[in-house]
Curated annotation (Swiss-Prot):
The gene is rplB. GO terms for molecular function: rRNA binding; structural constituent of ribosome; transferase activity. GO terms for cellular component: large ribosomal subunit. The keyword Ribosomal protein applies. Residues 229-239 have a biased composition (Basic and acidic residues). Belongs to the universal ribosomal protein uL2 family. One of its GO terms (biological process) is cytoplasmic translation. The lineage of its organism: Bacteria, Thermotogati, Thermotogota, Thermotogae, Thermotogales. This is Large ribosomal subunit protein uL2. Pfam families: Ribosomal_L2, Ribosomal_L2_C. Residues 222-274 are annotated as: Disordered.
Length: 274
């Protein structure tokens, strides 16, 4: 995995930093593991905009990823590392000993030809998935479940990971990518290692067109709108006239937006902001 820079033949080329895709070994996805992906343009089922500044972008097909890692005790061989347009991480195509094919998130250090295993008896090496109760304290993991059997929900983006800090009774203590310390049931599965494509954070789109290819539209400022469209709109000049707000009147700049009481609050040992 590396990054490409370009000769400054234009201002966009001067700034652009993109991956070199040297780790990709196969261009076309496995046909049995793809599904259609319909674009929403940021609209819900009523046709109303629920996420602003979304629309267009290159056509994609969804890759069906195995986040559950529930095929226990059967070894699988890595046959390819592939690009996935729906996520920042790369994905690895596995072929199990019984012939079944599945995609998983490709961790750092996983190469074509390697063998991976799911289950309590798996070795502690990148790509193997085990219950937290069978993983040594201090191990770096990703694709961590919150609810046993539901599938991994945490640390799935490029370069992210959690660290197993302690185990006590029914719960394991994990340090999240945000720095939060959180209890997770020891029966939950996690995959060993750090998610690959760690240089993703250093990529620079370089030009507006590359952002449009991803389906993101220009982010219009509130002060550039009319009063009917935004609390910051209208007026003479560019003044907001009052505290910064969202388009729906919720205060920005430090106002706490987290829901008051959540069932998982009792599992948070230390918040990410202390």
């Amino acid at each position: 995995m590396g990054l490409r820079r370009f000769k400054p033949t234009s201002p966009a080329r001067r700034q652009m930093i993109i991956p070199d895709f040297s780790e990709i070994t196969k261009k076309e996805p496995e046909k049995s593991l793809i599904a259609p992906l319909k674009k929403t343009g940021g609209r819900n089922s009523y046709g109303r905009v629920t996420v602003r500044f979304r629309g267009g972008g290159h056509k994609r097909r969804y890759r069906i990823i195995d986040f559950k890692r529930d095929k226990v005790g059967i070894p699988a061989r890595v046959v390819s590392i592939e690009y996935d347009p729906n996520r920042t991480a790369r994905i690895a195509l596995l072929v199990y000993a019984d012939g079944e094919k599945r995609y998983i998130l490709a961790p750092q250090g996983l190469n074509v030809g390697d063998t991976v295993l799911n289950g309590p008896d798996a070795e502690i090496k990148p790509g193997n998935a085990l219950p937290l109760e069978n993983i040594p304290v201090g191990t770096i993991v990703h694709n961590v479940e919150f609810i046993p059997g539901k599938g991994g929900q945490i640390a799935r983006s490029a370069g992210t990971s959690c660290q197993l800090m302690a185990k006590e009774g029914k719960y394991a203590l994990l340090r999240m990518p945000s720095g939060e310390l959180r209890k997770v049931p020891v029966k939950c599965y996690a995959t060993i290692g750090v998610v690959g494509n760690e240089d993703h954070k250093n990529e620079v789109d370089g030009k507006a067109g590359r952002v449009r290819w991803k389906g993101r539209k220009p982010h219009v400022r509130g002060v550039a709108m009319n009063p009917v469209d935004h609390p910051h709109g209208g007026g003479e000049g560019r003044g907001k006239g009052h505290h910064p707000q969202s388009p729906w009147g919720q205060l920005a700049k430090g106002y706490k937006t987290r829901r008051g009481k959540k069932a998982s609050d009792k599992l948070i040992v230390r918040r990410r902001n202390g």
